[in-house]
Protein backbone atom coordinates (compact mmCIF):
# COMPACT_ATOMS: atom_id res chain seq x y z
CA UNK A 1 0.00 0.00 0.00
CA UNK A 2 1.39 3.32 -1.00
CA UNK A 3 1.91 6.42 1.03
CA UNK A 4 -1.15 8.07 -0.51
CA UNK A 5 -3.33 5.14 0.50
CA UNK A 6 -2.11 5.30 4.11
CA UNK A 7 -2.74 9.03 4.19
CA UNK A 8 -6.28 8.38 2.96
CA UNK A 9 -6.88 5.74 5.64
CA UNK A 10 -5.57 8.01 8.41
CA UNK A 11 -7.63 10.96 7.18
CA UNK A 12 -10.75 8.78 6.95
CA UNK A 13 -10.20 7.54 10.52
CA UNK A 14 -9.70 11.07 11.83
CA UNK A 15 -12.80 12.28 9.96
CA UNK A 16 -14.94 9.45 11.34
CA UNK A 17 -13.77 10.15 14.90
CA UNK A 18 -14.46 13.84 14.42
CA UNK A 19 -17.94 13.16 13.07
CA UNK A 20 -18.77 10.72 15.86
CA UNK A 21 -17.66 13.10 18.58
CA UNK A 22 -19.51 16.06 17.13
CA UNK A 23 -22.87 14.35 16.86
CA UNK A 24 -23.41 13.58 20.53
CA UNK A 25 -24.89 16.30 22.64
CA UNK A 26 -24.37 16.69 26.34
CA UNK A 27 -27.18 15.34 28.42
CA UNK A 28 -28.93 17.87 30.63
CA UNK A 29 -28.44 17.55 34.37
CA UNK A 30 -32.10 18.24 35.08
CA UNK A 31 -35.22 17.34 33.16
CA UNK A 32 -37.33 20.12 31.66
CA UNK A 33 -39.87 19.98 34.50
CA UNK A 34 -37.19 19.89 37.19
CA UNK A 35 -35.29 22.77 35.62
CA UNK A 36 -38.33 25.05 35.77
CA UNK A 37 -38.83 24.28 39.46
CA UNK A 38 -35.13 24.62 40.25
CA UNK A 39 -34.88 27.89 38.32
CA UNK A 40 -37.61 29.40 40.52
CA UNK A 41 -35.90 28.12 43.68
CA UNK A 42 -32.53 29.46 42.52
CA UNK A 43 -34.14 32.85 42.00
CA UNK A 44 -35.51 32.78 45.56
CA UNK A 45 -32.08 31.94 46.98
CA UNK A 46 -30.42 34.62 44.85
CA UNK A 47 -32.91 37.22 46.08
CA UNK A 48 -32.61 36.21 49.74
CA UNK A 49 -29.57 34.00 50.43
CA UNK A 50 -30.08 34.24 54.20
CA UNK A 51 -33.51 32.57 54.05
CA UNK A 52 -33.02 29.04 55.44
CA UNK A 53 -36.30 27.86 53.93
CA UNK A 54 -35.24 28.90 50.42
CA UNK A 55 -31.83 27.24 50.80
CA UNK A 56 -33.51 24.10 52.17
CA UNK A 57 -35.94 23.90 49.25
CA UNK A 58 -33.22 24.38 46.65
CA UNK A 59 -30.88 21.84 48.23
CA UNK A 60 -33.76 19.36 48.52
CA UNK A 61 -34.66 19.90 44.85
CA UNK A 62 -31.08 19.12 43.84
CA UNK A 63 -31.07 16.00 46.02
CA UNK A 64 -34.38 14.89 44.49
CA UNK A 65 -32.84 15.37 41.03
CA UNK A 66 -29.88 13.18 42.10
CA UNK A 67 -27.26 15.90 41.80
CA UNK A 68 -25.82 16.02 45.33
CA UNK A 69 -22.81 18.04 44.22
CA UNK A 70 -25.06 21.01 43.48
CA UNK A 71 -26.81 20.56 46.83
CA UNK A 72 -23.41 20.64 48.55
CA UNK A 73 -22.55 23.82 46.68
CA UNK A 74 -25.82 25.49 47.72
CA UNK A 75 -25.27 24.68 51.40
CA UNK A 76 -21.56 25.52 51.42
CA UNK A 77 -22.15 28.88 49.74
CA UNK A 78 -24.96 29.84 52.14
CA UNK A 79 -24.24 32.28 54.98
CA UNK A 80 -22.99 30.74 58.23
CA UNK A 81 -26.25 31.54 60.03
CA UNK A 82 -28.13 29.43 57.48
CA UNK A 83 -25.60 26.59 57.55
CA UNK A 84 -26.04 26.31 61.33
CA UNK A 85 -29.75 25.48 60.97
CA UNK A 86 -30.33 21.81 61.86
CA UNK A 87 -32.48 21.08 58.80
CA UNK A 88 -29.79 22.52 56.51
CA UNK A 89 -27.12 20.39 58.20
CA UNK A 90 -29.42 17.37 57.81
CA UNK A 91 -29.66 17.96 54.05
CA UNK A 92 -25.91 18.58 53.94
CA UNK A 93 -25.32 15.18 55.57
CA UNK A 94 -27.46 13.48 52.94
CA UNK A 95 -25.59 15.22 50.13
CA UNK A 96 -22.27 14.20 51.68
CA UNK A 97 -23.44 10.60 51.93
CA UNK A 98 -24.58 10.65 48.30
CA UNK A 99 -21.14 11.97 47.37
CA UNK A 100 -19.46 9.05 49.14
CA UNK A 101 -18.25 10.90 52.24
CA UNK A 102 -19.70 8.88 55.12
CA UNK A 103 -17.35 10.22 57.81
CA UNK A 104 -18.18 13.84 56.96
CA UNK A 105 -21.88 12.96 56.75
CA UNK A 106 -21.74 11.43 60.23
CA UNK A 107 -20.11 14.58 61.60
CA UNK A 108 -22.83 16.74 60.03
CA UNK A 109 -25.59 14.49 61.34
CA UNK A 110 -24.04 14.59 64.81
CA UNK A 111 -24.19 18.41 64.66
CA UNK A 112 -27.92 18.08 63.91
CA UNK A 113 -28.41 15.82 66.93
CA UNK A 114 -26.41 18.19 69.14
CA UNK A 115 -28.52 21.15 67.98
CA UNK A 116 -31.74 19.19 68.58
CA UNK A 117 -30.95 18.30 72.19
CA UNK A 118 -33.55 19.68 74.59
CA UNK A 119 -32.61 22.83 76.43
CA UNK A 120 -32.96 23.59 80.12
CA UNK A 121 -36.69 24.13 79.70
CA UNK A 122 -37.10 20.72 78.03
CA UNK A 123 -37.94 22.07 74.58
CA UNK A 124 -36.05 21.36 71.39
CA UNK A 125 -35.62 23.67 68.42
CA UNK A 126 -36.22 20.70 66.08
CA UNK A 127 -39.45 18.99 65.20
CA UNK A 128 -39.89 15.30 65.93
CA UNK A 129 -39.55 14.29 62.28
CA UNK A 130 -36.11 15.90 62.01
CA UNK A 131 -34.97 14.39 65.29
CA UNK A 132 -36.14 10.90 64.31
CA UNK A 133 -34.66 11.15 60.82
CA UNK A 134 -31.32 12.46 62.08
CA UNK A 135 -31.14 9.79 64.77
CA UNK A 136 -31.84 6.99 62.29
CA UNK A 137 -29.39 8.32 59.71
CA UNK A 138 -26.68 8.87 62.34
CA UNK A 139 -27.09 5.26 63.50
CA UNK A 140 -26.71 4.00 59.93
CA UNK A 141 -23.75 6.29 59.25
CA UNK A 142 -22.08 5.17 62.47
CA UNK A 143 -22.38 1.56 61.29
CA UNK A 144 -20.99 2.46 57.86
CA UNK A 145 -18.01 4.19 59.44
CA UNK A 146 -17.40 1.29 61.84
CA UNK A 147 -17.43 -1.12 58.89
CA UNK A 148 -14.95 1.10 57.05
CA UNK A 149 -17.35 2.03 54.25
CA UNK A 150 -16.77 5.56 52.99
CA UNK A 151 -18.92 5.35 49.85
CA UNK A 152 -22.18 3.51 50.49
CA UNK A 153 -23.01 3.42 46.77
CA UNK A 154 -19.74 1.70 45.90
CA UNK A 155 -20.28 -1.05 48.49
CA UNK A 156 -23.98 -1.99 48.43
CA UNK A 157 -23.55 -5.26 50.30
CA UNK A 158 -21.68 -3.62 53.19
CA UNK A 159 -24.23 -0.80 53.16
CA UNK A 160 -27.01 -3.35 53.53
CA UNK A 161 -25.18 -4.91 56.50
CA UNK A 162 -24.75 -1.47 58.09
CA UNK A 163 -28.43 -0.67 57.54
CA UNK A 164 -29.48 -4.01 59.02
CA UNK A 165 -27.21 -3.55 62.05
CA UNK A 166 -28.50 -0.03 62.66
CA UNK A 167 -32.18 -0.81 62.28
CA UNK A 168 -32.56 -4.20 63.87
CA UNK A 169 -34.87 -4.38 66.83
CA UNK A 170 -33.80 -5.57 70.22
CA UNK A 171 -36.41 -7.72 71.90
CA UNK A 172 -36.59 -8.25 75.61
CA UNK A 173 -38.13 -11.42 76.94
CA UNK A 174 -39.54 -10.97 80.42
CA UNK A 175 -40.27 -14.14 82.40
For each feature predicted by the language model, list its residue ranges:
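Long, contiguous interaction/recruitment modules in multidomain scaffold/adaptor proteins
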Residues: 1-40, 174
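TPR-repeat structural position
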Residues: 31-34, 68, 102
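Alpha-solenoid helical repeat scaffolds
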Residues: 53-57, 86-91, 107, 121-131
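Terminal, low-structured helical/coil segments at or just beyond the last alpha-helical repeat
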Residues: 121-175
Amino acid sequence: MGLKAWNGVVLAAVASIWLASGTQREKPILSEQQSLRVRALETQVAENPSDPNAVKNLAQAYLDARVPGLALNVVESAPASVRREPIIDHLYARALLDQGRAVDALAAEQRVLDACEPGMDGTSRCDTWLLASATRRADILRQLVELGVEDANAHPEMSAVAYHNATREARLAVR
